[in-house]
Amino acid sequence: MLPRRLLPLALSALLLGGCAGVGTQLPSAAYTAAFERAARQDSMRSECDWRVRYAPVAPEGASLAQLQALATARLAALQLTPAWTLAMPGSEAHAFADTDADRAGLQLLLSIVLPAMERYPAGIFAHTGLRRVVLVKDLSVEGQRRLAMPAPEIDSVVYADNMLAAMCPSGMELRVHHEYYHFIEYRLFNDFYYRDPAWLALNPPATVYGQGGAAAYGKGFQNLGHPHAGLVSLYAAYGPEEDKAEVFGWMMTPAYAPRLQQWTAFDPALLAKRHMLMEVLNTMAGSY
């Protein structure tokens, strides 16, 4: 793995160089600046294993219609349907167009989202009331740029290409699972911010949560792993709702699960949290 101080340079050189192959023109100065800014602001950059890559879901040159048809078929096998637009108060996003750049963005997004969703036990989405996966680009929530969000009010989770090519691929998969857990939590308690007493009881006595996950956005935040006993990541410390979603995300993402497993070998609080979420997952899968 590259030293952390070299990662932004490596991203710009390798990933942006690859983007130059899309179409016939080199990226504009504005695009290059936006790409490099997205790379620097990727909160999973410091904890990324850059060797982990996701296979394309379709041949190079697949049309937008072909990519959408492939996504529709694979999601149908999970009892899910895709949506290609988003209309929710406080949120904005754009639909993918049939351009080289958008096809490449959708191909990358699908290469991460589809296998992530296929990791779940059969029937779990139906049991939790998830019906749709919204796949868009340029997502923002209350003006904050986002890659994903839960949307239980429309029975959906939302995943977006938002300069995704500049970011850690496995970090995006972690976000897929993280946001789905927020969806699960809302279905269980009708509240995104439920302070579950059973969960809080697992914390070491010195655990103090922050002011919620939104406070981490736009500040160059780096989501470092296992900063304190009982916490899988720095972002987990922002609130019990983020703590749960982070443990779930690390547990479900193959590139991160081994580290969680290692930490639980000497952190009994984190081990208990992982066991609790495994029980939630198994209960929901088994009750379908």
Language-model segments: which ranges?
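Bacterial N-terminal signal peptides that target proteins for export
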Residues: 1-8
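Active-site-flanking segments in enzyme catalytic domains
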Residues: 129, 134-288
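C-terminal motif of bacterial Sec signal peptides marking the signal peptidase cleavage site
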Residues: 17-18
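Auxiliary, metal-adjacent structural segments of Zn-dependent hydrolase domains
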Residues: 90-154
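Low-complexity, intrinsically disordered repeat segments enriched
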Residues: 63-87, 210
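Acidic/histidine-rich, surface-exposed loop or edge segments in extracytoplasmic proteins
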Residues: 49-55, 76-104
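Post-signal peptide N-terminal segment of mature Sec-exported envelope proteins
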Residues: 25-48
